[in-house]
């Protein structure tokens, strides 16, 4: 059971995010739309991960486990794709990278087909649930591609002296994965991908344009304008009174 503890925590985080994000109006832009897709995909990702674990525990049917593992890895590639899209959408205001987005989409489709149709060797021993084979390698390769993309984008933004605030969660994701692989060398049964994505999406929630904050700023600005206009009116009345008295 300890193998999916992180997945369960990840599920609690993503459910909380879904409630927070969809329970109030959001700014209608590409950033929030992409973020909505990310949290939706991550919810499915975690659910499939937990379901796969229980199917393994209850049935030990390697063929059925393999099918769910392939679905799990396919959703991971979509998470990677929309994460790369997110980085481009946030910074590509002039839409200069349309061709790059198409290339990333095509690579992802090919990766998903490879995951679904290439052989996968299911590893299930005790609490350990893993896989090897060409299908697994394709999923790992696509994840490495996305991480390389995040690093390149970060370097580009630093060189151009742009803010990297919105891409920091993905740098944290890379660090978490590296730490996760080290920890997994000692606790091989741990499944951490869903938890890590839930965690960085929680961080991202605080970097996207918050409609409540935006509204509060607009109200404060309107209040300041009204106060300034009121002061000018009072000053004008005082000046008129002084002129009448003189």
Describe each region flagged by the PLM:
Residues 61-72, 127-139, 192-197:
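Non-cytosolic membrane-interface motifs at loop->transmembrane helix junctions
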Residues 34, 99-100, 131-139, 154-175:
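Membrane-helix boundary/juxtamembrane motif in polytopic membrane proteins
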Residues 84-95:
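Class A GPCR helix-loop hinge within the 7TM core
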């Amino acid at each position: 059971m300890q193998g999916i503890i992180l997945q369960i925590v990840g599920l609690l985080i993503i459910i909380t995010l879904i409630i927070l994000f969809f329970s109030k109006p959001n700014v209608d832009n590409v950033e929030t739309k992409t973020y909505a897709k990310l949290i939706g995909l991550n919810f499915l990702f975690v659910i499939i991960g937990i379901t796969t674990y229980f199917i393994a525990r209850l049935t030990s049917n390697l063929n059925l486990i393999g099918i769910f593992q392939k679905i799990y890895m396919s959703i991971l590639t979509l998470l990677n794709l929309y994460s790369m899209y997110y980085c481009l959408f946030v910074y590509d205001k002039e839409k200069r990278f349309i061709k790059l987005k198409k290339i990333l989409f095509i690579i992802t489709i090919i990766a998903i087909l490879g995951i679904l149709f290439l052989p996968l060797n299911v590893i299930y021993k005790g609490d350990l649930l893993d896989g090897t084979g060409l299908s697994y390698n394709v999923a790992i390769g696509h994840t490495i591609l996305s991480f390389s993309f995040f690093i390149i984008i970060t370097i580009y933004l630093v060189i151009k002296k742009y803010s990297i605030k919105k891409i920091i969660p993905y740098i944290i994701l890379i660090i978490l994965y590296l730490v996760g692989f080290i920890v997994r060398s000692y606790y091989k049964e741990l499944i951490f991908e869903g938890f890590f994505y839930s965690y960085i999406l929680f961080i991202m929630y605080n970097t996207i344009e918050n409609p409540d904050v935006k509204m509060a700023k607009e109200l404060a600005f309107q209040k300041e304008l009204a106060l300034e206009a009121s002061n000018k009116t009072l000053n004008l009345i005082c000046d008129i009174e002084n002129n009448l008295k003189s």
